[in-house]
């Protein structure tokens, strides 16, 4: 939510994968979940990624990508319900401005947030479609921070993750925004574990594409 190409995790992954057979792709998609889903589906068809990483609210869009392994950082599975319940604020004078002050997007290659009643209400069926896609099976693994401030509000729910995917997660001693040390110590090794290619493939002969959704 409000992330993009110059966010921490995409930047670190791109830097780490320079000169390797891994390519990290980040594209900013629309805050309207249905427009965003259509954009992402088009990119997946174009790029044929080998792995999708969903961070924060981007986890819901990532769940709707079928047929490839999934990794998640601080998946905000409770966010759709939160946004639906908060939609009424958009109808109050000054409500939209208040939401933009609370969730201020940094300058740069970031997702513009559009707090509109109709858009926020769409997150209900968006979450239903994500759960339906996840129920079809696949590889799902998540990382949660012990000091994630969104866990108090229920936006991030480890218990809900367990309900859907079991104990397929690691909890690190950090925040919602995975610190650099854990990107190197946890996320990147897990990426290599999933995308461990054939030993006889020479460097430069094969590239693995990773798409990051935030």
Q: Where are each of the predicted segments found?
A:
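Gly/Ala-rich beta-loop-alpha elbow adjacent to hydrolase catalytic centers
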Residues: 53-58, 62
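Short hydrophobic segments within beta-strands
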Residues: 1, 53, 143-145
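The alpha/beta-hydrolase serine catalytic core
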Residues: 69-198
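Active-site catalytic motif of lipid deacylating hydrolases and related acyltransferases
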Residues: 1-46
């Amino acid at each position: 939510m409000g992330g993009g190409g110059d966010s921490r995790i995409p930047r670190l992954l791109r830097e780490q994968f320079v000169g390797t057979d891994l390519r990290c792709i980040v594209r900013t998609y629309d805050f309207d979940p249905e427009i965003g889903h259509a954009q992402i589906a088009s990119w997946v068809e174009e790029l044929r990624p080998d792995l999708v990483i969903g961070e924060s609210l981007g986890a819901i869009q990532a769940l709707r990508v079928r047929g490839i392994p999934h990794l998640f950082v601080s998946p905000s599975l409770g966010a759709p319900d939160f946004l639906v319940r908060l939609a009424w604020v958009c109808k109050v004078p000054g409500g939209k401005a208040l939401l933009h002050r609370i969730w201020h997007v940094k300058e740069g290659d970031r997702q513009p947030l559009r707090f509109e009643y109709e858009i926020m209400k769409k997150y209900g069926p968006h979450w239903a479609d994500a759960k339906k896609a996840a129920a079809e099976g696949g590889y799902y693994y998540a990382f949660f921070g012990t000091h994630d401030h969104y866990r108090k509000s229920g936006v991030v729910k480890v218990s809900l993750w367990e309900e859907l995917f079991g104990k397929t997660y690691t909890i690190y001693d950090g925040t919602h925004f995975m610190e650099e040390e854990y990107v190197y110590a946890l996320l990147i090794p897990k990426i290599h574990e999933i995308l461990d290619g054939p030993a006889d493939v020479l460097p430069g002969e094969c590239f693995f594409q990773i798409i990051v959704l935030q």
